[in-house]
Amino acid sequence: MAAACTVSRGRLLIAAVVVLLIVGLSWGIGSAVAADGSASPAADGGKTVLRLGWTNDPDNLNPFIGYESSSYEIWAINYELLVGFRAEDYANVPDVGLATGWETSDDGKVWTFTITDQSRWQDGEPLTARDVAFTFNYIIDNELGMFVDYVKFIDKVEAPDDTTVVFTCSKPKANMLALWVPILPEHIWSKVDPSEVENKFKNEPPIIGSGPFQTVEWKKGEFVRMAANKDYWRGAPAIDEIIFLTYQNQDTMAQDLKAGHVQSAWNIPAAQFKPLNNEPDLESIRGVVIGLDELGFNCADKKKYPKSTGHPVLQDPAFRSALQYAVDKEKIVSIGYNDNANPGDSLLTRGFYDPDADFYWTPPADSAYTFDLDKARQALDEAGYTDGDGNGIREYKGKDIRLRLYARSESPESQKCGKLITGWFKEVGLDIDFQIIDDGALGDKQYNYEHGEFAPDFDMFIWGWGGDVDPNFILSVLTTGSIESWSDCNWSNAEFDELFLEQQTTIDLQERIALVQRMQEIVYRESPYIVLVYPLDLETANKGKWTGWVRAGNDQGLWWYNTQPDTYVAVHPEGSGSATAGGPNTALVVGVLVAAVAVGLVILRVVRRRGRRAETEA
């Protein structure tokens, strides 16, 4: 065997089955809290509890249904991966997931993994290679949409003994070490009807996994409570519980940070970034994350999808690419994101990858789309979209071009960007109907069906994607096969599809990089998306009274909300040592701090991973 990798046992983002789930607004229950930030909830016998604030409630705890990034965060510490990602550099290495080592055959088609014999399920049952084989075969045999692209080219998975699992592939599999598939307990999930797993099965707490924490309670719109797994095979977490508190108002969350009611918060208001950083004990960071926010077009082919309501001009790449010149990304960053983003261009995140393995494609300076309204007008003229009657609006087949643009009520950024884009597009001669709707309504429009036929009901939208460390996921979103599934723009390109398959089976890194970069170039020129920005996520933590915060991505990422367990396992009150040795803290009633607001709810960017809509709401 070749490419052996074995190390002695030592101690990320997002595709889903889109379901009709609208995050409900909740007027939260009040709670008595300790104001000094060093104490933790002690309603259950003095437990050390880490309280974290976020604005993005999980949509579903079933990993075959949920798609919000907050759901992924829960799964990342409730379950384990076969091969994990090292927090400091996101590298796939042994002993971060269940695998302690692996080997590949000379032809790259057979992968043999050795897994730890120390991990146990949170109900006490041993975790074995049979659970790993079951998880992957369950997905393969039932073609479960959320993970189906991860298992592409895997024919079968076998467990010859308790610590060995063998993957047999039809072709070499370049991303074999980067499969974000949570390993599930066979003794529980084998009883779940595959026909219901994508639409009915709720996976209600307590959720049995093998990770450092277990989800024991979830009140939608209020909180998620997770208990430490004291038998975690890499060592028990230093705390007893985590409470993820869902806020409907960012300013309230910021005030609770100042008061010490929460120890850290993700997606803090941009206006509060510096003030919070100036508070005693608090530190604020801007974290580089894998992801993008985009202006997407409904590119659905009217011949194949006659019920699509997308304007016909959006099928023309010349029309779409002309609009690239009509978007000022510097203003998008400064006005839309308060400078908490980097200008976007390519499909993969700039500045994220290792220089020796950089998949990002840089548009050549002499052919890059730069903001120039005159160039946009010229390109539209050359594409045949002119103003024939002199009313200031360009025409298609004698009728004014009127396009619907949707921004999300949950995202102030998308709303500000929508207003800017509406103004620029009007300046180049388009009639824009700008509307603000919620996530659920937008998802309904993107995955609309009329009498059983796919009928996407939109023209343009502003949303975003979270990605994986490996580029395969975000590339898969734009394949033809993902239409009616992960694709939200319904674009189809034969060369892109062919390259997508080829890069998956190209083991040589530099050869694969060349293929992936060519794919990005195609997307850039065809413009099914105009990539607006690579957002920076904002976090604040109480580093004065709590220690053990582990920042991911070579100190450029986040402390938490990064699908990495490191911070959750290590963080604890300053001077307490560990949860078992630190003793009780100041008494506090466990509750949820959710502001009661009827209008003007402010929730920052929601990164999502999308999948096909399930037939039945879970």
What residues fall within each predicted segment?
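Gly/Pro-rich hinge or "lid" segments in bacterial periplasmic/extracellular proteins
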Residues: G84-D89, V181-P237, E241, D251, ...
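Surface-exposed binding/hinge segments that line
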Residues: T114, V148-V192
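Long beta-strand-rich cores associated with HINT superfamily self-processing modules
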Residues: A39, A541-G577
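Ligand-site clamp/hinge motif
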Residues: T116, F201, N229-P275, T422, ...
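Structural transition elements
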Residues: P343-G388, R408-K416
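N-terminal lobe/hinge region of extracytoplasmic solute-binding protein
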Residues: G53-D106, N137, P206-G209
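Periplasmic binding protein-like
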Residues: L52, G124, Q263-N267, D281-E283, ...
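Extracytoplasmic/peripheral linker and loop segments enriched in polar/acidic and small residues
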Residues: K109, P317-S321, Y325, V333-S334, ...
